[in-house]
Amino acid sequence: MLIRFSTVALAAGTLVSGLSPSDIPSDTPISSLLTSAQNHLSRGETIDALVYYDAAVARDPNDYLTLFKRATTYLSLGRTAQATEDFNRVLSIKPGFEGAHAQLGRIKARGGDWEEAKKQYHMAMKPEDAKALEVAKGAAKLAEAAAKTGNWEECASQADEAIKVAVRSLPLRELRARCRFESGYAAGGIADLQHVLQMKAGDTSPHVKISAIQFYALSELENGLGSIRKCLHSDPDSKVCRKLLNQEKAIDKALQRIARNLENKQFTIASRQLIPTGEGDGLIKEVKEQVKILREDGTIPSSLPNSLVSRLVSMACEAFHEVGYIIHFCRGCSPTDIMYSQKT
């Protein structure tokens, strides 16, 4: 006879496991189940270990040590909600169990729930963890204060300290992303937004911001296109994501045509594709207008560079030079405002 379990956690765990709960004979001693779980853990087979822990818990739901081991296994898989539930079950069976309080304290601390984490650490008799928690809490407050005064580097620095403890705090990640962007640290801000995406399932706005910054501010066209495609993968019906993807694809295609013309020494054609002529406004103006909109709505922070426009201007300078034009950059105006006159 075989045991078949139907709990949600078990079903989820076995989706990527080579082991099925039906593979475990019903008369397997609990001690053997626990030994098998430990053996799988030692080999890094965490999902398979979880199947054995599930079987052991189903056989004896009041064994708090087995529940605790399953909870730590859940935690190693990033299943915080299930781990929290098991740790709370442990405490309902064994009140005051310090190991469960300590783990709950760490879970709460990682999420930036300072007061609940402090409470759990107190019950776990973990004064050093409680001390580190207070330091992180203080740093978080200093980061918020620095942001209010526009001291972006101080904000990012204090947020660094807080996030060492509160690694899964959504407000802190969003705050540090903002402060990093405002201080000109684009890569760091993008890294934080990628964490935000993991914590805010279904929210496409970080995808849009990441893509626009990569594509326009940093001139990382492939990365920008890849990020906005992830947005549509997350929400295929998103009009905002679709609009930005179409916009970026059109620019990328136009830029590739210009690059080919320059490579083939068709400099006149390339220059006409870049600047306003009777045939159109040119790619530089088109991109500048798109960037203006993205900066005005806050998608691209004003502190970040204009690398794509600068790249296009450089291409225009190359084309103009080759066809015999003198390039003028007027003092006090934008370096993207190109003026030119024919050589005599």
Where are each of the predicted segments found?
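Structural marker of alpha-solenoid helical repeat scaffolds
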Residues: 59, 93, 127, 165, ...
